[in-house]
């Protein structure tokens, strides 16, 4: 990147301000965004179900009052008995995998049989596939759009990491070069000056239209500085200049300075400022537009490229500075699909928040901590943190604090704020809850971002899991947004600690530091009931997401979107129902992805017999303890 001092005239024609009616908010937001001491509740792992060991299988006999929950130990338990009762009853049971190996799957069988039941009085149940059928969207195009968006994001991030494999990251302090002339940023003078409006800056670009990232296959992007603040500089690629006028870039800058930087600095940390200019570059460029084919159902909205943090001796395309690349306004479709002016500018702040979270985490793990690019966070947790950043900015903009258990009316008081920062994460979590047991929550078999809808579900799990973790274990009071000081948890996760831990090990490290169960299997057991028990009457506090009322929000989205997927039901997670009744004799075969759970509900409206549940492999054998299977039970009635 070269920073030149002359200031050309600002091109462009005025554009009419777009007005978006509230009724169209949901359709517009169906395109995804880019890419201390603490006290907490006693986890359910502390409350083990009573066991009975006799001839044959080890049994667990449930003796729970409404609102009670318990956990069956990880190994050896094969039979769960629900005793006979003289009144109505309802139990929610989660069969959970604690495997931490991405891509792993366990095949299980649950037999449910009432005492004295004759064989096959009730037809055997078949576990539903719990995948989203093509017609569940109402419009098949919506499904293709979401899958294409996920696939494009996956392709870029995979290529970006591959491009810097083996490259050395820059360090925060670099020696001044012998020649102080016009050079690229990684050869800048020791004390460069901040940019000024009208300056010309030349960036190197390594991202090709096919989303390949090549450290050597670069071309220059000449841009002009349009707005400068204390922490950000807005620059416009001259290739697409002239569309955004009338103070719109200044408005974007104001939102970044006012809403994004203070929040993300508290939750994630400060950028390293490796180019010493005091700002993060926000580059609106057709480079981003060209990554979307003209006939695509979606579009890339922006990205952060780790190559910009690499030593230029290893990656010639490195700009040696902090840069966020954002979609340029292109109403005439010169570069790809048309991009309305308002679409590019109003969506920019949310995309910038997401990508800035990636950038700060990457710098803390490489530039500042002396790590390599192999220290970058695993995909599932990296995306969970970045999507959480969107929520923090949205809550700040709505003046909401953690722990408020906000419903739809409070969250959507500003439809624009809700649609930009909050709605996308509810949609992702709904995809997860439609089929939690099939979701690759830790990524694919190579710990990468999975393809299509599975990627959205993985991100939904990560966002919801971190939201629950912070709600349960953050230190009370003193938080940046008011309420709990949850930013300490996210700040610790983003950096990875002295050893730059990643993924599950990183979560375990931070959980221990903040009073949560420190072993992944125990943390998952504490989490297991949350997706189905949040805001369920009588459910224990440990099962609650305390900042948002999931049932209220999902019911409202189901109503507002008229059942459009993933909000086809008023609550997306539907347990497999098995009656507590005479004659119950059911067999359910199901699969369980690593670190996920399968949800059952056993219910009677009156007196009921004893029902015995037997959990085995699909071959009818005892489940090996190596599979990390646990059973978590909550009585709700």
In which residue ranges do the predicted regions lie?
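Beta/coil-rich, acidic/histidine-enriched accessory regions frequently appended to metallopeptidases
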Residues: 45-69, 73-76, 81-85, 496-637
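Structural helix-adjacent loops and short alpha-helical linkers that scaffold large soluble proteins
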Residues: 396-402, 472-488
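Juxtacatalytic substrate-recognition/specificity segment
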Residues: 230-378, 385, 389, 395-403, ...
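N-terminal module-boundary/linker segments of secreted carbohydrate-active enzymes
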Residues: 45-269, 273, 277
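Bacterial N-terminal signal peptides
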Residues: 22-34
């Amino acid at each position: 990147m070269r920073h030149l001092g002359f200031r050309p005239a600002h091109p462009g024609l005025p554009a009419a301000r777009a007005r978006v009616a509230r009724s169209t908010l949901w359709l517009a937001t169906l395109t995804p965004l880019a890419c201390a001491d603490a006290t907490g509740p006693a986890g359910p792992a502390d409350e083990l179900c009573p066991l009975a060991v006799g001839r044959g299988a080890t049994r667990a006999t449930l003796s729970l009052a409404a609102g009670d929950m318990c956990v069956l130990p990880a190994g050896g338990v094969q039979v769960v008995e629900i005793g006979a009762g003289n009144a109505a009853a309802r139990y929610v049971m989660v069969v959970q995998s604690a495997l931490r190996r991405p891509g792993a799957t366990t095949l299980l069988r649950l037999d449910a049989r009432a005492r004295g039941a004759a064989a096959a009085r009730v037809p055997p149940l078949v576990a539903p596939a719990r995948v989203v059928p093509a017609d569940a969207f109402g419009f098949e195009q919506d499904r293709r759009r979401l899958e294409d968006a996920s696939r494009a994001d996956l392709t870029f991030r995979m290529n970006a990491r591959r491009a810097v494999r083996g490259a050395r990251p820059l360090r925060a302090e670099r020696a001044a070069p012998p020649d102080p002339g016009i050079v690229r940023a990684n050869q800048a003078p020791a004390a460069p000056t901040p940019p000024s409006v009208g300056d010309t800056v030349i960036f190197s670009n390594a991202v090709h239209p096919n989303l390949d990232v090549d450290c050597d296959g670069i071309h220059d992007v000449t841009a002009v500085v349009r707005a400068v603040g204390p922490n950000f500089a807005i620059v416009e690629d001259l290739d697409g200049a002239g569309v955004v006028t009338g103070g719109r870039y200044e408005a974007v800058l104001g939102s970044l300075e006012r809403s994004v930087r203070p929040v993300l600095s508290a939750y994630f940390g400060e950028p390293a400022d490796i180019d010493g200019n005091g700002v993060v570059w926000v580059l609106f460029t057709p480079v981003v537009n060209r990554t979307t084919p003209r006939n695509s159902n979606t579009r890339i909205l922006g990205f952060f490229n780790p190559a910009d943090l690499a030593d230029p001796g290893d990656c010639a395309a490195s700009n040696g500075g902090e840069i966020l690349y954002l979609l340029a306004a292109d109403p005439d479709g010169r570069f790809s699909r048309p991009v309305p002016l308002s679409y590019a500018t109003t969506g920019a702040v949310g995309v910038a928040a997401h990508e800035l979270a990636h950038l700060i985490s990457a710098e803390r793990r490489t530039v500042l901590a002396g790590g390599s690019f192999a220290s970058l966070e695993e995909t599932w947790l990296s995306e969970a943190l970045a999507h959480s950043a969107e929520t923090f900015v949205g809550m700040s903009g709505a003046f909401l604090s953690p722990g408020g258990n906000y419903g739809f009316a409070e969250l959507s008081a500003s439809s624009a704020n809700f649609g930009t920062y909050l709605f996308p994460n509810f949609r992702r979590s709904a995809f997860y809850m439609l089929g939690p047991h099939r979701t690759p929550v830790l990524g694919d078999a190579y710990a990468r971002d999975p393809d299509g809808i599975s990627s959205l579900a993985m991100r939904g799990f990560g966002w919801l899991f971190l939201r629950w973790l912070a709600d349960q274990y953050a230190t009370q009071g003193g938080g940046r947004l008011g309420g709990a000081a949850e930013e300490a948890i996210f700040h610790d996760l983003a950096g990875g600690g002295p050893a730059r831990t990643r993924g599950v090990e990183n979560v375990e490290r931070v959980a221990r530091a903040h009073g949560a169960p420190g072993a992944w299997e125990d943390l998952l057991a504490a989490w297991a009931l949350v997706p189905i028990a949040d805001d369920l009457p009588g459910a224990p506090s440990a099962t609650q997401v305390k900042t948002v009322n999931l049932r209220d929000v999902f019911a409202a989205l189901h109503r507002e979107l008229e059942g459009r997927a993933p909000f086809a039901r008023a609550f997306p997670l539907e347990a497999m129902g098995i009656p507590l009744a005479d004659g119950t004799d059911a067999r359910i075969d199901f699969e369980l992805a690593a670190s996920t759970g399968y949800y059952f509900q056993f219910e009677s409206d009156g007196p009921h017999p004893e029902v015995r549940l037997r959990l085995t492999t699909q071959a009818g054998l005892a489940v090996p303890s190596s599979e990390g299977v646990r059973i978590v039970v909550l009585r709700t009635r």
